[in-house]
Amino acid sequence: KGLDMVKEGGLLAYITSQGVADSPQNEIIRQAMLSSARLVSAVRLPNNLFTDYAGTEAGSDLIILQKDSQRGALNPIEEQFCNTARLPQGMLQNEYLSQRENVICTDALAGTNLYGQPAMVYTHSEGVEGIAKEVKERILSDFKKHYLSPETAQQSQTTQIKLQEVNSQKNEVRLVLEIAKEGSLILLS
């Protein structure tokens, strides 16, 4: 429903529990998310991200979508994002997020999720600042590969991102990506 509030080409960022991406029962939800949007970035966050502020260790994901009501078929990365894979340890995990490059962590151990089900437990030893640095790097890399500027969306050319202030009269998107000192992620358009 969040995508209904976003204009064409706009961005929507979700922080969700890992269950949204990992559960085979949620495959239909992931497909619905991508029926009118493109996957710009999906990052598995460490379980200890919210420990200092909320006193909880819960696995979560950052998912960034770009509204595209006229999109065609899913690309290979989006297909992976819709699929659940069984890891060698018997755990179920999102196929795309099971790749190490999409996980922000310094340690990964077999454990359980909040419901006692077998799951990978990811932690980061460098605190919020270390986590923020890695999240920023991952998102910037993903934006360079997967973000469609208004021009490229209309012309179906290569993806690009502009990380500078642009002239709003040209109907271009201004995107500012900043990791605040507290480690919060700010996306403006």
Q: Which residues make up each language-model segment?
A:
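Charged, often flexible domain-edge or linker segments that flank or initiate folded functional domains
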Residues: 144-189
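Conserved Class I SAM-dependent methyltransferase catalytic core
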Residues: 1-51, 58-65
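Flexible, glycine-/basic-rich loop-and-beta segments that form/coincide
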Residues: 52-156
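Generic hydrophobic/packing signal
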Residues: 14, 26, 37-38, 134-135, ...
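Weak global preference for isoleucine
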Residues: 15, 20, 28-29, 64, ...
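Ordered hydrophobic segments in well-structured contexts
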Residues: 11, 41-42, 62-64, 103, ...
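Context-gated lysine
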Residues: 1, 7, 67, 133-136, ...
